[in-house]
């Protein structure tokens, strides 16, 4: 997520909507492309696309997340033990009280997820908008929202809190790597890379830092209301 900004987007390749995926898989596919601010390139035969697939591609609320002027890419803040991922990003105002979240279930079974507002840095009463269903949900007043996610499906919500809490965890995989590559022998060449790590909060880590003066990692989006 550190590499996405206005005019610089991670291209996740063309969309496979309308080409045989299940409805749940299409929601995941298009929803993740939108919350990651990936370019949206339709890759199906538009003369034969199913009506539900076309309606998904025309979902204005999802497209608004994709085209949000902050141009941010969502990042993982939590991987639950049942394999469900929680993604989040600011929309509309940087470090504001409105955030987009995606709860992604890649498993082959329906899963439950307890969305704790502390994990997405929101406080007080939180308004919830389901962007797939185009409807407002019950306001979260006790800090936790319980969600069921079918197999291979994703739920995407717009959350509007009363207050914004300061982010307390900056995962390694959200940092900028000045010298990054995923090929070759990184240590001897002085390049860092990202790797999987189940014991880490977001399920990822950074490896092979050092061995070159420019082989470092940094967070470029740290925010605090006060100095010090």
Model-predicted segments: where are they?
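Short intrinsically disordered, low-complexity coil segments enriched in acidic
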Residues: 1-5, 86, 228
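A general structural signal for short secondary-structure junctions and capping/turn motifs
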Residues: 6, 21-26, 32-34, 54-55, ...
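Carbohydrate-binding surface patches
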Residues: 33-36, 41-43, 80-122, 152, ...
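Glycan-recognition surfaces
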Residues: 1-45
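Catalytic cores of secreted or luminal carbohydrate-active enzymes
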Residues: 28-78, 152-174, 178
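Extracytoplasmic
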Residues: 111, 120-131, 135-228
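Surface beta-strand/loop "capping" patches
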Residues: 76-98, 167-170, 176, 210-218
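Active-site-adjacent structural elements in folded domains
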Residues: 18-20, 81-88, 140-142
């Amino acid at each position: 997520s550190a590499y996405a900004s206005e005019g610089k987007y991670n291209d996740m390749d063309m969309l496979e909507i309308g080409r045989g995926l299940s409805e749940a898989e299409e929601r995941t596919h298009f929803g993740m492309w939108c919350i990651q601010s990936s370019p949206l390139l339709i890759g199906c035969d538009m003369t034969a696309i199913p009506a539900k697939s076309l309606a998904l591609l025309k979902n204005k609320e999802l497209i608004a997340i994709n085209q949000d002027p902050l141009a941010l890419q969502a990042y993982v803040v939590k991987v639950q033990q049942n394999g469900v991922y929680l993604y989040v990003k600011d929309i509309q105002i940087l470090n504001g009280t409105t955030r987009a979240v995606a709860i992604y279930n890649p498993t082959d079974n329906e899963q439950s997820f307890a969305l704790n507002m502390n994990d997405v840095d929101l406080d007080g009463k939180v308004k919830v908008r389901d962007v797939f269903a185009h409807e407002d949900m019950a306001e979260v007043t006790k800090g936790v929202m319980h969600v069921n996610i079918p197999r291979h499906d994703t739920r995407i919500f717009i959350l509007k809190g009363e207050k914004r809490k300061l982010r307390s965890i900056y995962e390694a995989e959200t940092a900028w790597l000045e010298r990054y590559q995923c090929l070759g022998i990184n240590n001897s060449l002085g390049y860092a890379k990202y790797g999987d790590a189940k014991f880490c909060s977001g399920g990822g880590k950074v490896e092979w830092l050092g061995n070159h003066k420019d082989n470092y990692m940094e967070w470029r989006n740290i925010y605090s209301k006060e100095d010090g």
